[in-house]
Amino acid sequence: MTDTVIDKIIIESKKAVGVECIDKKGRRFSLKTTKEVILSSGAFGSPQILLRSGIGPETGIKRHGIPHKHELPGVGKNLQDHLEVYIQQKCILP
């Protein structure tokens, strides 16, 4: 399943039951589960998937023609990527 991206989460009866995917050739397909859906796409990717799924602030979602499924006002707000840089230097003088 390389070169495949998640377009949105499939929600049925207010429960996440799977994901809709797009492969490198543009073909759409669904993957469903009987257990749980874990979203882990980073600081920018996770809110993007949630918003495309209809999860987030109603006004922003409906403006883009996406059916609103769950009100969650904080989605897509306060976006920050938490970059870290480690520098090690050997000191030759005390």
Label every PLM stretch briefly.
Residues V5, I9-P94:
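Glycine-rich loop(s) and the adjacent beta-strand/alpha-helix scaffold that form part
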